[in-house]
A protein has these predicted regions:
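Glyoxalase I/VOC metalloenzyme domain signal
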Residues: 1-8, 13-33, 50-106, 113-276
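Conserved beta-strand edge residues that scaffold enzyme active sites
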Residues: 40, 108-109
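Conserved catalytic-core motifs of GNAT/GCN5-like acyltransferases
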Residues: 33-39
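Short beta-strand scaffold segments in enzyme catalytic cores
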Residues: 46-48
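Short acidic/glycine-enriched loop/turn segments that link adjacent beta-strands
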Residues: 40-44, 256-258
């Protein structure tokens, strides 16, 4: 069978029902956010747009029960989203590989522009709950990319130009290795100390043990809170470490081995790092 080539569409930080606080936190950390969006599925969000990928800060309106997975999950990094240009083909490939997925689902959100409001339309192929216990994994097919990647939203005080890396912490990384091999084929992953890496376009997903996570991030890492696996950290490319430092130092950031690191407790449960 032909496996899809993994590319990164976006990453998701869950702020549950605290969208105002979540958005303000990420603005203070130097991200330019889009105006608030409201999905037809019931969730709401702000985006930080980069060159070819983006960060989504997502929440559920208080009292709204249409997106229970948002309120049932802890705050923090909760979604890693692959790109696809053909959601039907991706769905067929996942089925053939034995990966439990839902059929493609379509939704939209209005985007208010100077010339008027238009609907951004998406179709996703989501892995079923429990397949990746660390959080949500899915594919996103954009039908209106011009409404999402707009230049006025791609300039950030912290200098971010893209997502370099996402980190998953797992007591047994081999479980994720087996899943990613089923999704993307033999040779999609390679070993690293305490785990493995999946190359995702110009980015990468590292799946590492708690020991390796602690060595790299120390007390800046998220609290495992009894979880065997969880999505832990994001590393962003920046055009200037000084810009990243100026934007984040008020949030408890530190400089460490050529990077700027923001502790999870200052970024709604997700450790953030900035690199050149």
């Amino acid at each position: 069978m032909i496996h899809p080539v993994p590319t990164l569409d976006h990453v998701v930080v869950n702020v549950r029902d605290r969208i105002d606080e979540g958005a303000e936190t990420y603005r203070r950390l130097g991200f330019t956010l889009t105006p608030r969006g409201f999905h037809t599925l019931g969730s709401m969000n702000h985006l930080a747009m980069f060159g070819t990928d983006y960060l989504e800060v997502i929440a559920a309106p208080p009292g709204d029960t249409r997106r229970p997975e948002i309120m049932e999950a802890p705050e923090g990094l909760n979604g890693l989203v692959f790109g696809t240009e053909d959601s039907a083909a991706t769905y067929a490939a996942m089925q053939s590989a034995g990966v439990p997925v839902f059929p493609p689902g379509e939704f939209s959100r209005p985007v208010v522009l100077p010339e008027g409001s238009r609907d951004a339309v998406f179709r996703t192929v989501r892995l079923m709950p429990g397949v990746a216990p660390s959080g949500r994994l899915y594919f996103c097919h954009h039908f209106t990319r011009d409404l999402v990647w707009r230049d006025e939203w791609r300039h950030h005080p912290n200098g971010t130009t893209g997502i370099a890396r996402a980190v998953i912490c797992a007591r047994d990384p081999s479980e994720f290795g087996a899943l990613f091999t089923r999704m993307f084929g033999e040779g999609a992953t390679r070993p690293i100390d305490g785990g493995f890496v999946l190359t995702v376009g110009v980015s990468r997903f590292d799946v590492i043990t708690p020991r390796v996570l602690a060595v790299e991030f120390g007390d800046a890492a998220p609290d495992a809170a009894g979880r065997d696996s969880f999505m832990a950290a994001l590393e962003f490319r920046t055009g200037s470490l000084d810009a990243a430092w100026r934007a984040t130092e008020g949030g408890g950031a530190r400089r460490d081995r050529g990077r700027v690191i923001v502790p999870a407790n200052a970024a709604f449960g997700a450790t953030l790092a900035f690199c050149l």
